[in-house]
Amino acid sequence: MELKKQILRDSYAVKITATEGDKVLGWGFLYVIYNDRHPEPYGLIENVYVEQEYRSQGLGTKILKDALQEAKDRGCYKVLMQSRHGKTEVHNFYQKIGFKDHGVNFRLDLIDSKPKQRD
């Protein structure tokens, strides 16, 4: 048996950043991913973050809806999101947007890496 690797150049990432002047208020990432299971790509939204002082003002909703529109524009047939256990407020926010709890994620850390921003 032989394993072959192929770099898929049609998969890519989009960073959505909310700013006010030079100040970054929040961001999110949309990854558009192609595979052989479906003819259309799927989207993966990760690391949606809003600075503490700008939360509860609709900014997270705007970032998320912009990412969802980008996924639609790119022809994604579904969008996935991930979140850690115990983040009830975040989970409620995602459900309010229309996401549903679906399955289980598994993770294996390959290196010890800490996020740049706080929760």
Task: Describe each model-derived feature in a short phrase.
Residues 1-40, 65, 109:
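Acetyl-CoA-dependent GNAT
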Residues 71-83:
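Conserved GNAT acetyl-CoA-binding A-motif
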Residues 51, 84:
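Residue-level recognition of the GNAT/N-acetyltransferase active site
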Residues 50, 56-69, 96:
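Conserved acetyl-CoA-binding loop-helix of GNAT-fold acetyltransferases
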Residues 61, 85-103, 108:
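Conserved active-site alpha-helix within GNAT-family acetyltransferase domains
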